[in-house]
Amino acid sequence: MTLILGIDPGSRITGFGVVRETARGCEYVASGCIRTGNGPLHERLQVVFRSVREVIRTHGPTTLSIEQVFMARNADSALKLGQARGAAIVAAMEEGLSVAEYTASQVKQAVVGTGGADKQQVQMMVMHLLKLTQKPQIDASDALAIALCHAHTQQSLVPHGLVGARRRGGRLRL
């Protein structure tokens, strides 16, 4: 059994989701939102770092799966998002986790079946796949979807002997 931590990074709200990958599929472990408040950016990044580290220490995942930065219309927002991602990745690396990164369209494709799915479609499929009875918060459901994406990607690579391969530009490199 493998525990996967999915992170949907944000400078104000960072979603997290932990799933257990078993021979029968994935099971829900935990999810939630890290709310950083309205303080200066460096203080909010510290909250992301410490909170992600605490989630890791509480649940013991072996892998962090995180969404890649997309090109936002607002450059300032994209930079803050990138810094929040960095804080989460450093927390994971400090705790010895491997890190996997996925684009938003890869996550949507893996969970919903189409890269153009909206947040509500992702949320409903997360509920269905993990057999949840209540809707998780949007940021938490996105994080669970990122974790599910990693689990599905790993399952599809194992039969082909490509688990250790590196993904660059949409291609797998051995």
Swiss-Prot record:
**Any idea of its EC number?**
3.1.21.10
Active-site residues per Swiss-Prot or TrEMBL entry: D8, E67, D139
- GO molecular function: any one? DNA binding
Identify the enzyme class.
hydrolase
State where Mg(2+) 1 binds: D8, D139
Q: Could you tell me which cysteines form disulfide bridges?
A: none
Q: For this protein, what does the record note about how its cofactor is bound?
A: Binds 2 Mg(2+) ion per subunit.
Q: Which residues bind Mg(2+) 2 per the record?
A: E67
> Which Pfam family name is an example for this entry?
RuvC
The principal localisation class reads cytoplasm
Purpose: The RuvA-RuvB-RuvC complex processes Holliday junction (HJ) DNA during genetic recombination and DNA repair. Endonuclease that resolves HJ intermediates. Cleaves cruciform DNA by making single-stranded nicks across the HJ at symmetrical positions within the homologous arms, yielding a 5'-phosphate and a 3'-hydroxyl group; requires a central core of homology in the junction. The consensus cleavage sequence is 5'-(A/T)TT(C/G)-3'. Cleavage occurs on the 3'-side of the TT dinucleotide at the point of strand exchange.
Q: Which family does it belong to?
A: Belongs to the RuvC family.
Entry protein name: Crossover junction endodeoxyribonuclease RuvC
